[in-house]
A protein has these predicted regions:
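A conditional alpha-helix N-cap/helix-loop micro-motif detector
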Residues: 51, 67-68, 143-148, 183-184
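Glycine-rich, phosphate-binding/catalytic loops in enzymes
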Residues: 103-106, 182-184
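Short, basic, glycine/proline-bearing loop/turn elements
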Residues: 88-90, 132-141, 174-177
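Non-catalytic C-terminal accessory region of glycerolipid acyltransferases
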Residues: 2, 8-11, 147-278
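Membrane-anchoring hydrophobic helices of lipid-metabolizing enzymes
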Residues: 1-88, 98-100, 107-111, 127-128
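Conserved nucleotide-cofactor-binding alpha/beta core module
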Residues: 111-152
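Short His-Asn-centered micro-motif
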Residues: 88-91, 115-117, 167-169
């Protein structure tokens, strides 16, 4: 199958008017909104780096933002399992954590892919390392079909002997009842897929978080929170993202779990155990 050409912008007027017909013919208004939401900055960085898609793109993006990655137990990345394996991670940032994950694993295994929400699939320079699914698939047969294709693609990736990354929460972290930023329950669909894959699992924890304003918007509406995501990316300019790499969990250990809820809790706990690392 012929690959779709890389689009130089992430989101522009033509995309918006197709999504929301109300904006058709209102190019100046759309461009104003794109600037207000920092999408114009995202478009610039994408255009600046999209000629080197995939893993090199992640390095260029992080370099343009002057973001440093501080990695605990980095030697574990140099001793990843041969053949197929899975990474599981918390999802506090919604975009930069996926980009950082692809950089640190993809530099060792260039064919590494990460399952992401359809929103991130607009970053066309990242599609070589993305498998996109739709979080709202249950409400729309067409979206459900896209997500099923994504699940099949993930299974084929592992069967081909390549690594696969998951953010099992399926959405960016949010405020819990104890006023901590935390993933929601890791999704049974992803946990079932991990169990079916029967390969080692590497937990990876991201210590960063988005702004309190982003968190508040998530309480009001996930759509408002999504609109804020580009600005959150640029809020991390000149920052350090702290990442911890956990010990590889053997496939045999995963096989011991018959209950998906218990397996999900176990994998999440193994990931969040690294929260205390400073």
């Amino acid at each position: 199958m012929e690959e779709t050409p890389i689009k130089r912008t992430v989101l522009d007027y033509d995309d918006i008017r197709k999504m929301v017909p109300f904006f058709d013919g209102k190019k100046r208004l759309v461009n104003f909104l794109l600037k207000l939401l920092s999408v114009d900055k995202v478009n610039w960085i994408h255009d600046h780096n999209c000629d080197t898609p995939g893993v090199p793109f992640t390095a260029g993006l992080l370099n343009d933002l002057n973001i440093t990655l501080r990695i605990d137990n980095e030697e574990r990345l140099d001793n990843l399992p041969e053949g197929s394996f899975i990474t599981v991670s918390n999802h506090p940032l919604g975009a930069l954590d996926g980009i950082a994950l692809i950089k640190i694993v993809g530099e060792r295994r260039p064919k590494f892919k990460v399952m992401v929400n359809m929103v991130l699939n607009y970053i066309s320079a990242m599609r070589p390392n993305f498998i996109a699914v739709d979080a709202l698939a249950s409400n729309d047969p067409k979206k459900k079909a896209v997500s099923m294709q994504g699940i099949k693609a993930a299974m084929m990736q592992v069967r081909a002997g390549e690594p696969m990354g998951f953010f099992p929460a399926g959405a960016v972290s949010k405020l819990n009842t104890r006023f901590h930023i935390d993933d929601r329950e890791w999704q049974p669909t992803i946990i079932r897929l991990i169990k079916q894959m029967k390969v080692p699992v590497v937990p990876i924890y991201f210590h960063s978080r988005n702004s309190w304003w982003f968190t508040f918007l998530g309480i009001v509406s996930w759509k408002l929170r999504t609109l804020r995501l580009p600005a959150e990316v640029f809020r991390k300019k000149n920052a350090t993202i702290h990442i911890s790499i956990g010990e590889t969990i053997p496939a045999e250990e995963i096989e011991k779990f018959d209950d998906l809820k218990l397996l999900g809790d176990y994998l999440k706990q193994k990931t969040y155990d690294m929260r205390t690392l400073k």
